[in-house]
Amino acid sequence: MKKILFPLIACGLVMPAVAEDKVPRTPSPKGAQVRIILPKNGKTVKGPVRVVFGLKGMGVCPAGLVLPDGKPMEKTGHHHLLVDTEKLPSMSLPMVASETLLHFGAGQTETVVNLPPGKHTLQLVFADFAHIAHNPPVVSKKITITVEAKAKKK
């Protein structure tokens, strides 16, 4: 029972701060940029799709990693890939992983995604150690790709 109760209490203590939008945001340096290197915007590709992330002016660091004094490492973060999303997630709250919001909290700089045939959009958001977008947010341009249907075997 204690194993279940403690996480519930912890969530109860944390959630009010999140709900009130009082989560501090980590500053991003001027000129910081994130981009999708591959695939190129407008291209037709075969699945599964290799996506390579690019970053300028900041460093990649695993989520949750802090300095010995408990403060986050400056000018660092990790990638979040938005797949087929209409709008950006909240920039002031932790981003919640889903089928359309993929986390790369181990510091990954590329991935392979299985997308069905058809048009798809991809966009990156670079976030801090707590999965919260920097201030100002470091967000890539949204790209559109087309995934080819696999040829049927005869």
Locate each region found by the language model.
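Internal, hydrophobic beta-strand segments that form the core of beta-sheet-rich folds
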Residues: 115-131, 139-142
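Short, compositionally biased P/S/T/A/G/V-rich stretches that sit at domain boundaries
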Residues: 21-49, 56
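Short acidic/polar inter-strand loop motif in beta-rich domains
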Residues: 88-91, 127-135
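A beta-strand/beta-hairpin structural motif
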Residues: 92-111
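Short, well-structured beta-strand segments within conserved domains
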Residues: 49-53, 109, 118-126
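Short beta-strand elements
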Residues: 136-154
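A glycine-anchored, Pro-Gly-centered beta-turn/N-cap motif
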Residues: 47, 77, 116-118
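Short amphipathic, basic-aromatic surface patches that mediate peripheral association
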Residues: 54-71
